[in-house]
UniProtKB/Swiss-Prot annotation:
Keywords: ATP-binding, Cytoplasm, DNA damage, DNA recombination, DNA repair, DNA-binding, Nucleotide-binding, SOS response. Its main location: cytoplasm. GO terms for cellular component: cytosol. Can catalyze the hydrolysis of ATP in the presence of single-stranded DNA, the ATP-dependent uptake of single-stranded DNA by duplex DNA, and the ATP-dependent hybridization of homologous single-stranded DNAs. It interacts with LexA causing its activation and leading to its autocatalytic cleavage. This is Protein RecA. Belongs to the RecA family. It is found in: Cytoplasm. One of its GO terms (molecular function) is single-stranded DNA binding. InterPro entries: AAA+_ATPase (IPR003593), DNA_recomb/repair_RecA (IPR013765), P-loop_NTPase (IPR027417), RecA-like_C (IPR049261), RecA-like_N (IPR049428), RecA_ATP-bd (IPR020588), RecA_C_sf (IPR023400), RecA_monomer-monomer_interface (IPR020587). The keyword Cell inner membrane does not apply. ATP binds at G73, P74, E75, S76, S77, G78, K79, T80.
Length: 351
């Protein structure tokens, strides 16, 4: 007679788990449940933000794909400018971008100046909130769009509110709309690898006293919970040349980050009509890392004297692309954001 093999409790647990996993896969498809070691996509895929400092603060080199990002702040702080830079970076990588303009305020000429290929960008100007979010849902489900920007949450007015009288109150209607939309969108976004960016405004809480910030974002709490990244954008300084204002100094803070450590900050210049000054970032980060030397008001890169005053150096580097690219290459190598360029001799030695 053959002896019946007895299983240890641990083996019985494994067999029960394997049976459950095979049942789940038959019912819901392959990949419904997996070990992290089985997943080939554990590294976070990103879309660069267009700002070296912001990419560094985000910890992964950009905004994550397959997740929701919220950019919020006061008016004219640079929220839409940042989102347009992200669209431009996505298009540089050969991706497809969509802009849902709920505010009906997108400046196409400004977008072009930031590097956005407006002829290739999908744009929608919906009439009400449900339409905007349905369009976003369908674009995400198509698996053919890399980034979707919704500008802004405050402009996503529920249809019931639009059809009501002007003085009629609709308590919590926008929060309910956003809560339902986020429950529906989040799973689809993750599967599609689309990066969805919500631009939001801030409001003052009524009757807030004592502890806590008096500011809050529109659209309820659902967006805060479902976001993987929340970026707070603030204008901290007005840039002037004598009496002429030519831009703003902006501080961004990563107040929530599920893909890297949060609460990192970055500062950079946003110039009117030009967007984020990448050249200005090269100067600031170059001085911070020691790649660009600063003595008084004079700047130097190695033996090359760049000029006196940041604005003069910025203009000089914009004209001298070879020198600007050399500084950028060295800075990105130092920050670990780009592989070092090998010389011909080093390449021959490796071969």
């Amino acid at each position: 007679m053959s002896k019946k093999t007895s299983l240890t409790p641990e083996e019985m647990r494994r067999e029960a788990l394997n049976t459950a996993l095979s049942t789940i896969e038959r019912k819901y498809g392959s990949g419904s449940v997996m070990k992290l070691s089985d997943d080939a996509h554990t590294n976070v895929a990103v879309i660069p933000s267009g700002s070296i400092g912001l990419d560094l603060a985000l910890g992964v080199g950009g905004i994550p794909r397959g997740r929701v990002t919220e950019i919020y702040g006061p008016e004219s702080s640079g929220k839409t400018t940042l989102a347009l830079h992200m669209i431009a970076e996505c298009q540089k990588q050969g991706g497809t971008a969509a802009f849902i303009d709920a505010e009906h305020a997108l400046d196409i000429n400004y977008a072009r100046r930031l590097g956005v290929k407006t002829d290739e960008m999908l744009i929608s100007q919906p009439d009400y909130g449900e339409q905007a979010l349905d369009i976003a849902d369908m674009l995400v489900r198509s698996n053919a769009v890399d980034v979707v920007v919704i500008d802004s949450v405050a402009a996503l007015i529920p249809q019931s509110e639009l059809e009501g009288n002007m003085g009629e109150t609709q308590v919590g209607s926008q929060a309910r709309l956003m809560s339902h939309a986020m429950r529906k969108l989040t799973g689809t976004i993750h599967k599609s690898r689309t990066s969805v960016i919500f631009i939001n405004q801030i409001r003052m809480k009524i009757g807030t006293m004592g502890y806590g910030s008096p500011e809050t974002t529109t659209g309820g709490n659902a967006l805060k919970f479902y976001c993987s990244v929340r970026i707070d954008v603030r204008k901290i300084q007005t840039l002037k040349d004598k009496e002429e204002v030519y831009g703003n100094r902006v501080r961004v803070k990563i107040v929530k980050n599920k893909v890297a450590p949060p609460f990192r900050e970055a500062q950079f210049d946003i110039l009117y009509g030009q967007g984020v000054s990448r050249t200005g970032e090269l100067i600031d980060l170059g001085v911070e890392t020691g790649i660009v030397e600063k003595s008084g008001a004079w700047y130097a890169f190695g033996s090359e004297r760049l000029g006196q005053g940041k604005e003069n150096v910025r203009q000089m580097l914009q004209e001298n692309t070879t020198l600007r690219e050399a500084i950028e290459q060295k800075l990105l190598e130092h920050l670990g954001m780009r592989e070092p360029v090998q010389s011909a001799d080093e390449a021959e030695k490796q071969d």
